[in-house]
Amino acid sequence: MPSYLTRQKTRKIFSWVGRPLPDRKHNHQIYKEMRMKVNDCSTEIHIKVGQFVLIKGNNNAKPYVAKLIELFEDGSKFHSKKCARVQWCVRFSEIPISKRHLLGRKPAAQEIFWYDDPDCGNNICVETIIGPVQVVALAPDEVIPMDQKSEDTLFVKLSWNTKNFEPLSPEVLAALKKLEDSPKCQKPLEGKSKNVKNPSWNATEQMVKRIESSHSTSKSCQTSAHPVSPNARKPLELSDSDIPRKPNMRLSQKILCDSLDSQKNSKRKTAFSETASPPKRCQPGEIKNLSPLKTLEKNGQAHSFCDKGSMILRAQDPSFITTKISMERALDPVRSRLRPSVMLTSILTPKRTGREAGKQEAHTEPTRTSHRVHRRSSLLTLNRIRQQLWLLDDDKSDQEEEESISSAEVSDSTSEEEDDSIPSLLKRNSQPQSRNRRMASKPSLQTPSKTPKKTTHHPTPQIRGRNIAVQEPTSVLEEARLMLHVSAVPDSLPCREQEFQDIYSFVESKLLDGTGGCMYISGVPGTGKTATVNEVIRCLQQAAQTNDVPPFEYVDVNGMKLTEPHQVYVQILQKLTGQKATANHAAQLLAKRFCSQGSQQETTVLLVDELDLLWTSKQDVMYNLFDWPTHKGARLIVLAIANTMDLPERIMMNRVSSRLGLTRMSFQPYSHNQLKEILVSRLKHLKAFEDDAIQLVARKVAALSGDARRCLDICRRATEICELSHNHGNSLGPVTVSHLMEAIDEMFSSSYITAIKNCSLLEQGFLRAIIAEFRRSGLEEATFQQIYSQHVALCRMEGLPYPTMSETMAVCSNLGSCRLLLVEPSRNDLLLRVRLNVSQDDVLYALKEE
């Protein structure tokens, strides 16, 4: 649909029509009709009760749609206010993304849905009304017409009750059908214009203005001849309805001919003989005016432009395209109206140089012989040009060339009389054509590629399928490993009952009140913050399905997944509306959505995880997230999660921390009893661990960090170690304390220590040589030659064969690639400087013999 009046900064004046009916109960004055007048315009639009209107919203291109139920003036306040009670209709883009799949089909572009929600506010201010709109009601079995002439017509056939789509009730459908049959609500009533002119002169002036505005290079300077209401702004259409139908058409036709003939003295005259001379190129700064051109027939008579005229549009780009417009107007004796028939033909002419054009003109002047250019030859030339352009151009240019050829073929099927009256604009040039033929027939010297150059425009997206089904766990340890995974969703969330109840009560109260709020949740990693909030949202969604709480939209963003803090606006907007926009534009749209009072919008619950990663120097992202819920009428609930407990006091500005409010919650680290309860609830009835092993890992993790994720990872690693020991010959049994101790040592030890323990004997000997050289020299740096001498001495002491210089250099390079050593990036060989990337104590701890 085209853009509406909300983009135009004009002032509209609303006034009542008729006498009011008093409503003493509500202190209202009820009206049945109102008048809307745009400032500095004489056109008025009358809107009555029962009509559908467009109302200003967040998106100017897609305003809200509603049906007027009542017009009244509220006198309860100090200043009376013009108000209206409406019945809302929603577009498909206004429905939450998570519920759009319930429609089961692709909606039409002009389809709206009857909004069946009794809790939705239906009182608006009449100043937010843009104008009337036509809405057609359809039965469920009817098909939405696709060939509708008016783009402003909307169709409704289903209703939306915030849960699913249903057909319109018989009462609503009958009322809408009755409204369509009523003639008073079909079109807006416009007031009479102040300026009244002669009908014939109006018709002539409009046609002249339309011709000048459609062919002039300065279209912005042309103004309309008659005042048009800004509420009825539409794109210009070339149809029968654009030309006013007046009774005296012969007089207007005569005036049009006189006005066009009067311009011949000031404009360039061009006469075409049967052999057309090559047109001259226009200067870049020249304004090309169009004048009626006389066509000379064989008998020498010149026809008037009004009977049959042909205008040549010369493109400013002197390359290929010359557009020929032939306009015929015939008077219909039955309906007494002017019926224009417009024929557009695009002819491609090969580009000529100035020398060839001069020879052509010199050769044409003395001869004056008559030659007729056949359309078949022009089609052959077009085909050759198309073949060359197809090799050089992309798919878009190919489509344009096919359209030009199709238009030439259509013009070829016209009658002989029309073909004789059209002057010949295309002259064959044998030399360029022969060159083009040789170029087209010459084979390519490049090696043909095996893959095609052009890919399919609409590839079908597919998800990779599994060739083999997922194997079921074959042992108790495998099943326990699946249950202990961090991403596995448990049936219940133990040890966080109080925090769950506090968050649930906070969000539920905001949903019931229809207000916004913010809660700050902090705690060390692995204490169940995100899992608890997700469980709260899941329970609230189930309650919304049973009508225990109002429906809401849920959006979650994670600061860890964002490349830049301002991208959080883009993620929120895309998940809410499905639109893609830049960060600044998305911030403006979200501010308009949350800060303005949207009566029919659902409450939005926003979860912002890893809030501390959204910190910026100006802190504008955090400020906006905490400021939006504080606005009046903003139905936004923000749940912010961060790992820093004192984030508001430590890094936030005062203006940001004040917006955060006093609703805060802190998740304490898990104790050993809570960790043990979490492990038992995960394992359920499986006997995969000994009781002492579970007690040991719970106490170890609780003493260090209290991170439940770390506890689950240690238990999963212990099951792998237990299976590995079974493969070595031991009996398969539950995980013991020894298995857990080995897993704990791996988890809490450094990765460098683990890498040193897994090094080869030669690499460990090289590390010992580095430690010996550092102790000898007292420095933390040594050359490769010094370390090699120490390595050879250590090998002789232990009775091992010492490696060669090349083997030792390879060992040094390997340890440097593992980042255990800091090696100089040069080719100094023996003088290469080497340093340790870990402490000497860690190296000695990893190399000690157990």
Swiss-Prot record:
Positions of post-translational Phosphoserine modification: S259, S277, S291, S411
Localization (cell): Nucleus
Annotated SMART domains: AAA, BAH, Cdc6_C
Source taxon at top rank: Eukaryota
Main location: nucleus
Domain BAH, chain residue ranges per copy: 45-171
GO BP: any one term: mitotic DNA replication checkpoint signaling
Biased composition (Low complexity): 214-224
Listed GO MF terms: ATP binding; ATP hydrolysis activity; chromatin binding; DNA replication origin binding; metal ion binding
UniProtKB keywords: ATP-binding, DNA replication, DNA-binding, Magnesium, Metal-binding, Nucleotide-binding, Nucleus, Phosphoprotein
Region annotated Disordered, chain positions: 209-286, 349-376, 393-469
Keyword Signal among UniProt keywords: no
Post-translational modifications: Phosphorylated during mitosis.
Keyword Glycoprotein: no
Binding site for ATP: V489, G523, V524, P525, G526, T527, G528, K529, T530, A531, E610, N643, R709
Pfam families the record matches: AAA, BAH, Cdc6-ORC-like_ATPase_lid, Cdc6_C
Family the entry assigns: Belongs to the ORC1 family.
PANTHER family: CELL DIVISION CONTROL PROTEIN 6-RELATED (PTHR10763), ORIGIN RECOGNITION COMPLEX SUBUNIT 1 (PTHR10763:SF23)
Known function: Component of the origin recognition complex (ORC) that binds origins of replication. DNA-binding is ATP-dependent. The specific DNA sequences that define origins of replication have not been identified yet. ORC is required to assemble the pre-replication complex necessary to initiate DNA replication.
The protein's assembly and partners: Component of ORC, a complex composed of at least 6 subunits: ORC1, ORC2, ORC3, ORC4, ORC5 and ORC6. ORC is regulated in a cell-cycle dependent manner. It is sequentially assembled at the exit from anaphase of mitosis and disassembled as cells enter S phase. Interacts with CDC6 and KAT7/HBO1. Interacts with LRWD1 predominantly during the G1 phase and with less affinity during mitosis, when phosphorylated.
Record's protein name: Origin recognition complex subunit 1
